[in-house]
């Protein structure tokens, strides 16, 4: 039995190591699922909850224990675009609007993204979006370009440099079936072909659906829903015993916001929540997973004026057809989730993923 001096020394040592009662050091998450509602502000979340469940505060991720708000200005200040805000989320560094994960302002060097950080640890990686996959948000995680308009170069960055194991989203805009097949990817172009994949025995898949953003919910035709893409990505990536990083973007929330289309905005946000539910279902019972749900920026300057009950669109007003400077919500579940709270900057999420021994 330890004497009192030895017990005191052990207690101090445990605290120094971070495993005593005054704090705990967790391992880095083995699995990271990073879900981004493009253009999804606090009011978009409220509106979707009212429509889906009759009350605000009822979307799946709103039940997470840890939540906060993110500021999201670009390096030059003012209103962010998806390139600058996406880069801040992906790299933890501020850049100018339009820049994809390069130090601009600065020396123009490539900034390491969360996807690259996790890949360097031996993890599989994936990008999923309802926009075309070379659009700014997925590009920020898997490419390095001085302008978001370099879609052909972004596709080449995916294909030749970062090589995510799974890429699923809208096609065209620099994407090429033949080029990705030549680079070792199995390419699928519709929902049925995607869902027929042998997800237990395939590790390089590129879904190029159509020739631009996917259709608005709920009428997808032959194209997959966001939830179906997320579930497919999870089934492929979880074959890796070393873990994975998956970014899932509900991109069409933003498109609806730019045109002030209330029904489409609500339907897209509800489908985004369905994708979050798929992530939660996959992660249930695990102690090695981090789920982050957030947005890059708010689109439309939305205000919810009245709740009209479940199944009815709430009464809203829009103040712009562009982005706003509003803070955006952030929610976290799992490993390191307790680092989320209060008002944070979007650059801080990088360290939530990477913190740990």
Where in this protein do the model-derived segments appear?
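Bacterial N-terminal signal peptides that target proteins for export
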Residues: 1-10
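Bacterial N-terminal signal peptides
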Residues: 9-21
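Active-site regions of oxyanion-processing enzymes, predominantly non-cytosolic
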Residues: 25, 166, 196-208, 229-251
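N-terminal catalytic scaffold of extracellular/periplasmic and nuclease hydrolases
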Residues: 25-171, 176-198, 203, 270-273, ...
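Generic enzyme active-site microenvironment
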Residues: 36, 247, 293-295
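Functional beta-strand-loop-alpha-helix junction segments that form "active/interaction loops"
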Residues: 107, 188-230
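Active-site His/acidic residue clusters
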Residues: 136-142, 211-218, 233-234, 238-276, ...
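Extended C-terminal subregions enriched in glycine
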Residues: 261-307
């Amino acid at each position: 039995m330890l004497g009192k001096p030895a017990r005191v020394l052990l207690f101090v040592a445990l605290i120094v190591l971070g495993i005593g009662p005054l704090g705990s050091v967790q391992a880095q998450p083995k699995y990271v699922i990073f879900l981004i509602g493009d253009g999804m502000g606090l009011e978009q979340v409220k509106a979707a909850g009212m429509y889906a469940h009759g009350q605000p505060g009822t979307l799946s991720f709103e039940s997470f224990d840890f939540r906060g708000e993110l500021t999201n200005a670009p390096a030059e200040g003012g209103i962010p675009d998806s390139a600058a805000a996406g880069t801040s989320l992906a790299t933890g560094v501020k850049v100018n609007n339009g820049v994809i994960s390069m130090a601009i302002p600065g020396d123009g060097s490539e900034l390491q993204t969360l996807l690259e950080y996790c890949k360097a640890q031996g993890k599989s990686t994936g990008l999923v979006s309802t926009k075309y996959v070379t659009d700014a948000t997925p590009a920020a995680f898997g490419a390095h370009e001085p302008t978001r308009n370099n879609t052909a170069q972004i596709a080449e960055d995916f294909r030749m440099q970062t090589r995510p194991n799974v890429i699923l989203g809208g096609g065209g805009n620099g994407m090429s079936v033949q080029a990705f097949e030549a680079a070792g990817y199995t390419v699928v172009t519709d929902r049925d072909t995607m869902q027929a994949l042998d997800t237990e025995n395939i590790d390089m898949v590129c879904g190029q659906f159509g020739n631009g953003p996917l259709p608005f919910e709920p009428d997808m035709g032959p194209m997959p829903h966001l939830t179906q893409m997320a579930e497919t990505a999870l089934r492929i990536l979880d074959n890796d015993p070393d873990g994975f990083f998956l970014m899932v973007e509900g991109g069409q929330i933003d498109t609806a916001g730019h045109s002030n289309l209330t029904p489409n905005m609500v339907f897209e946000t509800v489908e985004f929540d369905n994708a979050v539910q798929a992530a939660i279902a996959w992660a249930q019972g695990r102690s090695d997973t981090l789920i982050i749900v957030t947005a890059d920026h708010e689109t439309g300057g939305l205000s919810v004026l009245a709740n009209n009950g479940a199944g009815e669109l709430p009464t809203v007003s829009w103040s712009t057809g562009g982005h706003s400077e509003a803070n955006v919500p952030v929610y976290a579940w799992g490993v390191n989730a307790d680092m989320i709270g209060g008002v944070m900057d979007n650059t801080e999420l990088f360290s939530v993923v990477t913190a740990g021994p």
